A protein has these predicted regions:
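Extracellular beta-helix/beta-solenoid repeat scaffolds
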Residues: 31-38, 76-186, 204-206, 210-240, ...
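All-beta strand scaffolds that present successive hydrophobic residues in beta-strands
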Residues: 61, 97-100, 123, 129-131, ...
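Bacterial N-terminal signal peptides
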Residues: 9-21
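Acidic Gly/Asp/Thr-rich repetitive segments characteristic of extracellular carbohydrate-active
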Residues: 52-83, 202-211
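Feature marks extracellular polysaccharide-active and adherence modules
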Residues: 82, 90, 103, 109, ...
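Right-handed parallel beta-helix/beta-solenoid
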Residues: 28-69
Length: 729
C-alpha cells in the first residue's frame, strides 16, 4: 500500500526528498544538527550551537544579571536560554540577534510593549516560547513583536534552508488580544466612494487604526480572467467605530456588490476581515530573505490572535530545491525551496498526551497578511483546530493540506481572500496534474486529501477556486491510528483508500467573487448548505471519485453578464464521467447560463472509472436560468447495447424563465437534451426521466436527444415548450 502511495504521489515525494532528504553517511557530522525528526531526516541545524550569551538564571531580559556576559544581548549575539531558566522579554529592542535557542522558557511580558529582532528563533523539544496565554493574553493596550531579520542563509550549515524564521520542536504558545469576530458579513453594499461600512453584528476588540480587507466581488467576464485580471480587493483602515457602523480613514475605490436573485432582490453581501493583531510575527524585509514558521515532530503549538505579516519564502511557481552530493556538500543552492511557508505544520504529530482542548495543534483568530505561496499549511499533521483565521493576499492558496495524509483536522469558520495563482483550471490537479507547481492555481482553500472536517468557511477573490479538493492521482495513504500517533512509525498508522473514503464533512461553506469556480470537488462525500455567487465558470465543479451528494446548494450569478452570448457560466458542472452516482437535492440556482450541466463524450467515457451506478438525480430543485438542466446521458458501446452507463432523473423541480437575450441557435429551456451536446455522436442516449415537472404531481415525461443524431433515435416526435428534445409520456 505504501509503495502504491509513493508511486501515485511521485512529485511530492521527490520534492520533499530534495528538500528534506537523507544526508549521506558522514555528511551529518559536518555540522551540528538535532537528531533526525520525521520529515527532516538530516536533522535541524543548531543555529546557536556556539552561543555568545547564555542565561545563568531566571529573570528579566533587561537585567544584566540574567546573562553570562553580565550585559543585555546586543547586535549579532547568539543567545541561549538554558534549560531550567525562565527569561521574560520586557524590552523593545532593535538590535539584530543572530539567533535564540530556547532550551528553557522564553516568555514575553503581557503588560508592556515588547520587540525582538532575530535571524532564527529555535524552540527545542524541551523548550517553551510563550507570548501570552489563554488565561493571560497580551493586553490590548500593548504589542509584542518578533521580527525575522533579513540575513543570508548559511549555505554550509543550512543547505535545505530550514532557517531564517521560527523553528519549533517544543511548546509554542502565543495569545494576542481577542478580536470578535475576526471577520463578518456586511449589512449593506459597500460601493465606491463610501466612507462608512455597516456590519451585521457588533464587534469586540476592533479599534481605530485596524486594517480591514474587502474582497473583489465581481463575476468576471471571460476576457477578464487570467493575465487580464486586475483585482479590485481593498485594504482600508478604521477611523472610528459607532455601534455597527465603521468609519474609514479613506473612501472605497471600488464597488463590492452582493448577490441578487433573478428578480434583482439583494440576497448575499460580502464579508470584511480584520488583519490587525497585537502579537506580530513579521519579516524585516519582504523583498529580501523572508522568514517562515515551521513546527515539527512533537511541537505543541497554540497560536491565537497572532498577526503573521509578510512571512513565507517558498514562491508560487516552479520549485527549485537545493542539491547535495554524496559527501553532503552543497552542489546547488535552490532558488525556490519547497516547504517554507508563512505557517507550516510539517510532520507535527503534537504532544504525546492530547492537550486539554482535544486538539494536537490550535490556530484560532490569527491573520496571515501576505505570503508568496501558501498562508497556512498542514502537512502530515493531524487532529488540529484551524478556526476564525483570516488569510489575505497569498499566492497559490490560502489554507492548505499538502500531501493528502492529513487527517481529522477541523477547518472551521476561516476567511481566505485574494489568492493569486496560475489560474489554470485543473479540477483534478493534485501534485501530479499541476506539476511543477502543486497547489498553485489560486484557491482560497486547497485540500489534498478527504479526511478532514471543513465547515463554516468563506473563500473570496481567488484566481481559480474558492475551495479546491484535488484528488489527482492520490490512492492509499497512511493515517494516524490514534491521537498523538507518530505516523513515521508504520505500526502507529492505518491505511486509508482515498478512492473510497468520503470527505468527513463539508458543510455551510461559501465562495464568491472574482473566481472561476466556487468549489472544485474530486472526492466522495456530501456537500451541504453551500453558497456560491459570482463565479465566472462554475458554481460547483464536480469530478467525484464515485459518489457525491449535493444538499441545499444556493448559487447566484450576475444576470447582466448573460447579455453576451460568450458568457457561459454553469451553476453545477458534473464533468464527463460514467459509473458515478450523483444526487443533487434542494438546489436553488439562479442567474446562470445553465443551472446544472453535465457533458458526455464517448471518447472519454472510460477516463474516470468508478463504482457508482452511473446516475444523476436532481430532486426538489429551483432553477431560474437560461437553461435549467442540460445533462448528456449515454448508452454503452454496441457490444453492450441497451445497458445505460449514464442516466438522469429530475423529480419535483421548478423551472422559471430568465429575462436575458435569446440565442436562436441555442434557445432557452427548462430541461434540455440538446444544449451544447457533442455534435454527430452516433450512439443513442438514455432519456432524462422527469417526474413532478414544476412540482406538479402527475406531470411526468421523458426527454430524448433530438439533434445531431441518426433518425429514429427517439421513440416519439412530440415537442413541448421549454423542453429541448423529444418528449414522450
Amino acid at each position: 500500500m505504501l509503495v502504491r502511495f509513493l508511486r501515485a504521489t511521485g512529485l511530492i515525494a521527490l520534492a520533499i526528498a530534495a528538500a528534506f532528504g537523507p544526508v549521506p553517511a558522514g555528511a551529518q557530522d559536518a555540522h551540528e544538527h538535532t537528531p533526525a525528526v520525521s520529515g527532516v531526516p538530516q536533522g535541524v541545524p543548531y543555529f546557536c550551537a556556539r552561543p555568545s550569551v547564555t542565561s545563568v538564571a531566571s529573570g528579566a531580559w533587561s537585567d544584566p544579571g540574567t546573562w553570562s556576559t553580565r550585559r543585555v544581548p546586543a547586535e549579532n549575539d547568539k543567545v541561549k536560554i538554558a534549560g531550567g531558566h525562565e527569561v521574560t522579554v520586557d524590552v523593545v529592542s532593535d538590535a539584530t540577534l543572530d539567533c535564540i535557542q530556547v532550551d528553557g522558557d522564553l516568555r514575553f511580558a503581557t503588560d508592556t510593549t515588547t520587540k525582538v529582532r532575530v535571524g532564527n528563533l529555535m524552540v527545542m523539544d524541551r523548550g517553551r516560547l510563550e507570548i501570552g496565554s489563554e488565561a493571560a493574553p497580551v493586553s490590548p493596550t500593548v504589542t509584542a513583536e518578533i521580527v525575522i531579520a533579513d540575513r543570508p542563509i548559511d549555505r554550509a550549515l543550512d543547505p535545505v534552508q530550514i532557517g531564517t524564521g521560527i523553528e519549533g520542536l517544543g511548546k509554542i504558545t502565543m495569545h494576542g488580544s481577542v478580536k470578535t469576530p475576526t471577520f463578518l458579513r456586511l449589512a449593506s453594499e459597500p460601493l465606491a466612494g463610501a466612507t462608512t461600512l455597516v456590519v451585521d453584528q457588533p464587534v469586540s476588540g476592533w479599534k481605530p487604526g485596524d486594517r480591514l480587507v474587502i474582497p473583489d466581488t465581481r463575476q468576471l467576464r471571460s476576457s477578464e480572467r487570467g493575465v487580464s485580471f486586475k483585482s479590485q480587493d481593498e485594504k482600508v483602515q478604521i477611523a472610528s467605530i459607532a455601534g455597527n457602523r465603521i468609519a474609514l480613514v479613506a473612501a472605497l475605490r471600488y464597488d463590492h456588490k452582493g448577490a441578487r436573485s433573478a428578480d434583482g432582490a439583494l440576497e448575499l453581501l460580502p464579508h470584511i476581515g480584520n488583519v490587525t493583531r497585537n502579537v506580530v510575527i513579521r519579516s524585516d524585509n519582504p523583498q529580501g530573505t523572508r522568514g517562515h514558521m515551521i513546527f515539527m515532530s512533537r511541537a505543541d503549538v497554540d497560536l491565537r490572535y497572532v498577526e503573521v505579516q509578510d512571512m513565507g519564502r517558498t514562491r508560487m511557481g516552479v520549485l527549485d530545491n537545493s542539491d547535495v552530493d554524496s559527501s553532503g556538500r552543497l552542489v546547488k543552492f535552490g532558488t525556490n525551496q519547497i516547504g517554507r511557508y508563512a505557517i507550516h505544520f510539517h510532520h507535527d504529530f503534537g504532544p504525546t498526551d492530547t492537550p486539554a482542548n482535544g486538539y494536537h495543534f490550535t490556530l484560532v483568530g490569527n491573520a496571515v497578511d501576505g505570503a508568496p505561496k501558501w498562508g497556512i499549511t498542514v502537512h502530515n499533521s493531524h487532529y488540529g483546530l484551524v478556526r476564525d483565521n483570516v488569510v489575505y493576499n497569498t499566492h497559490g492558496a490560502g489554507i492548505v493540506t499538502e500531501d493528502g495524509t492529513e487527517s481529522f483536522n477541523v477547518f472551521d469558520h476561516n476567511f481566505a481572500l485574494r489568492s493569486e495563482g496560475s489560474g489554470d483550471f485543473a479540477p483534478r490537479s493534485g501534485y501530479g496534474g499541476a506539476a511543477p507547481d502543486p497547489g498553485g492555481e489560486g484557491a482560497g482553500f486547497w485540500f489534498r486529501g478527504p479526511n478532514n472536517y471543513i465547515r463554516h468557511n468563506v473563500a473570496a477573490n481567488a484566481d481559480a477556486f474558492g475551495f479546491g479538493l484535488a484528488a489527482g492521482s492520490l490512492d492509499v495513504v497512511q493515517i494516524p491510528a490514534f491521537k498523538g500517533a507518530d505516523t513515521s512509525r508504520r505500526a502507529e498508522t492505518v491505511p486509508l483508500d482515498t478512492t473510497s473514503a468520503a470527505v468527513l464533512e463539508f458543510s455551510d461553506n461559501e465562495a464568491y467573487g472574482a473566481m472561476q469556480a466556487g468549489v472544485s470537488w474530486g472526492w466522495n462525500g456530501t456537500i451541504t448548505d453551500l453558497r456560491v455567487w459570482h463565479s465566472s465558470r462554475h458554481g460547483l465543479t464536480g469530478t467525484p471519485a464515485d459518489r457525491l451528494i449535493v444538499d441545499r446548494v444556493t448559487i447566484r450569478g450576475d444576470r447582466s453578464l448573460l447579455d453576451s452570448q460568450v458568457e457561459n457560466p454553469a451553476g453545477i458542472w458534473l464533468s464527463n464521467y460514467t459509473a458515478k452516482t450523483i444526487l443533487v437535492r434542494d438546489a436553488n440556482v439562479q442567474g446562470m447560463r445553465t443551472g446544472i450541466a453535465s457533458p458526455f463524450y464517448q471518447g472519454l467515457r472510460s477516463a474516470e472509472p468508478g463504482r457508482g451506478d452511473g446516475s444523476v438525480a436532481v430532486e426538489r430543485g429551483y432553477f431560474r436560468n437560461y437553461v435549467g438542466i442540460s445533462i448528456a446521458t449515454a448508452y454503452t458501446a454496441s457490444a453492450e447495447a441497451g445497458a445505460a452507463i449514464k442516466t438522469a432523473v429530475v423529480r419535483d423541480s421548478v423551472f422559471k424563465t430568465l429575462d436575458v437575450p435569446v440565442d436562436p441557435l441555442n434557445p432557452p429551456a427548462a430541461i434540455s437534451m440538446n444544449h451544447q451536446m457533442a455534435p454527430g455522436d452516433p450512439d443513442p442516449r438514455a432519456p432524462i426521466v422527469v417526474s413532478g415537472f414544476n412540482a406538479k404531481s402527475g406531470d411526468d415525461f421523458k426527454v430524448y436527444y433530438s439533434l445531431a443524431a441518426p433518425a429514429g433515435v427517439a421513440p416519439c416526435d412530440e415537442t413541448r415548450p421549454g423542453i429541448g428534445g423529444w418528449v414522450c409520456r
